[in-house]
Amino acid sequence: MIQKNWQELIKPNKVDFITHGSRTHATVVAEPLERGFGLTLGNALRRVLLSSLRGAAVTAVQIDGVLHEFSSIPGVREDVTDIVLNIKEIAIRMEGEGPKRMVVHKEGPGVVTAGDIQTVGDVEILNPEHVICTLDEGAEIRMEFTVNTGKGYVPADCNRAEDAPIGLIPVDSLYSPVRKVSYKIENTREGQVLDYDKLTLNIETNGSVTGEDAVAYAARILQDQLSIFVNFEEPQKEAPQEQVAELAFNPALLKKVDELELSVRSANCLKNDNIVYIGDLIQKTEAEMLRTPNFGRKSLNEIKEVLASMGLHLGMEIPAWPPENIEDLAKRYEDQY
């Protein structure tokens, strides 16, 4: 009895991942959800996506000839404060643990980009076109970056080590690979119920992880955190093999017709004709259906299309139909249709 608290809640029968041809943008659509669960899951996933996924970021930079972030560099158009702001936007993917070192050394004139940085084997720059600073004729700059892994946002003050050498400038670190997350909740239909939730998540990452993987990681984090609150063991329910073998027809025939996505008119006609299960419906011929009051050619075509999507059609013969224990069988095989 207690299992009905979660077993009888409707779950999404599909989750669509739309990449828009980009590694950094994705849309995730899940439907149907119980009313209210779109907001519950959408908000929880958004918070975890933005705060709890691990990534890599620059934690500090040392620039030759510069003692602090309020300096300026001869021949460099940006001051050090602007350079540090640009460094914060470098997108990095790093395998393994840190910290790691990266170096850039360039002479002017020209633009210094993230692609000019010399990296070690397990560190990759994901936005090489990102501009760090601009050099005039005769200018030269050398910078050494410290890169580490972490999660969430860490301010520069927390990246300042007590034994840091003079000239090492700490940087605000945004470790999260997820840059933006938004979601919206819409009504969706399942059978004759029109007010289930449809959850749409829009995700933007820095490219170190895809939107689909980011959602999977966030869901796994939530699953792990919530599991501690489950204080019981759920008994495993396995259908005996002999019970499965006794069924002489497609289990889909045990599905009720009011669970099909039919128009209200078609559904009412079936109800008035005492057609409860799909097994009842497919044994009807087209001529018999057209003799049903208020049932026209449009409703007939609609039903034929729905049945065809299930590999069924009108006028089928089911010798073992209806079974004596049809309601018990419908409950037993509900996971198979």
Curated annotation (Swiss-Prot):
GO terms for molecular function: DNA binding; DNA-directed RNA polymerase activity; protein dimerization activity. It catalyses: RNA(n) + a ribonucleoside 5'-triphosphate = RNA(n+1) + diphosphate. Residues 249-337 are annotated as: Alpha C-terminal domain (alpha-CTD). Signal peptide: none annotated. Pfam families: RNA_pol_A_bac, RNA_pol_A_CTD, RNA_pol_L. The keyword Transferase applies. Its EC number is 2.7.7.6. GO terms for cellular component: cytoplasm; DNA-directed RNA polymerase complex. It is an enzyme of class 2 (transferase). Residues 1-233 are annotated as: Alpha N-terminal domain (alpha-NTD). It comes from the Bacteria. GO terms for biological process: DNA-templated transcription. The keyword DNA-binding does not apply. Keywords: DNA-directed RNA polymerase, Nucleotidyltransferase, Transcription, Transferase. InterPro entries: DNA-dir_RNA_pol_insert, DNA-dir_RNA_pol_RpoA/D/Rpb3, DNA-dir_RpoA, RBP11-like, RNAP_asu_C, RNApol_insert_sf. DNA-dependent RNA polymerase catalyzes the transcription of DNA into RNA using the four ribonucleoside triphosphates as substrates. Belongs to the RNA polymerase alpha chain family. The N-terminal domain is essential for RNAP assembly and basal transcription, whereas the C-terminal domain is involved in interaction with transcriptional regulators and with upstream promoter elements. Homodimer. The RNAP catalytic core consists of 2 alpha, 1 beta, 1 beta' and 1 omega subunit. When a sigma factor is associated with the core the holoenzyme is formed, which can initiate transcription. This is DNA-directed RNA polymerase subunit alpha. It comes from Brucella melitensis biotype 2 (strain ATCC 23457).
